[in-house]
């Protein structure tokens, strides 16, 4: 069982498996500092290639820098991988996130990620969040300039609305959109539908609701048991069937959990099974998860 079973989607000119890996959880508590078990993290990252995972998503604010450094240490020179990173957020303290979309700050973020990841050009650089205190056109303009100069291969957006996507498209081709989305929290449904219409990959972060959907007491547990799979696999399988444009990026520091997540790529839900999981999600109380 490998991630290839989920199929692929084109991110610009790059084909990626639709079950990827989110590297936010490679850090310590509060997405700050080093992980508690560095050996487990390295084992997890080293297992990605053998499991067919080809897309890895990180950010300079994870750690900060810790996640990018660990990805580089385990995967460089990235043969067979598309490595995406993000910039535009800064970290005042654990669990805290602040935007900094000043053009000079965004340029510094890209230059820093190039150095930290050890590459001459970033496969995919995503604006982590549009800074409401800086004109969006100024943020988009410097990103477009960096792409033209060869620092960035493809540009993506994160935590955005449909109008923001359209504003960005005036400056550059939007290669991907990354928003919070899972079977319970579907506030980004209009964004997903817009991406489908445009043929833009939609990267679903927190696909397991920071672990709540994968827990033994998950609201999906009874339905998953009937299917002979784990609750987390049910959540991921629902996402992968929801749209061929969705890329799910569950994260973990545990090699066993990684294998469990990847096995979800081979789960083939019937239309009835998909509808049942959807009904459960709609009945559930909305899980209010943070949006870094």
Region roles according to the model:
Residues 1-82, 210, 286, 291-292:
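N-terminal binding-site loop/beta-alpha segment at the start of enzyme catalytic domains
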Residues 3, 130-292:
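Beta/alpha (TIM)-barrel catalytic core signal, keyed to glycine-rich beta->alpha loops juxtaposed to Asp/Glu
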Residues 13, 50, 72-82, 114-118, ...:
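Acidic (Asp/Glu)-rich catalytic clusters
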Residues 21, 58, 85, 124-127, ...:
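Conserved beta-strand positions
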Residues 27-31, 90-97, 214, 257-260:
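A short acidic, helix-capping loop that chelates divalent metal ions and anchors anionic groups
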Residues 34-48, 101-117, 161-166, 187:
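Short, acidic/polar
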Residues 53, 119-122, 152, 174:
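A structural motif
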Residues 114-132:
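Active-site groove signature of glycoside hydrolases
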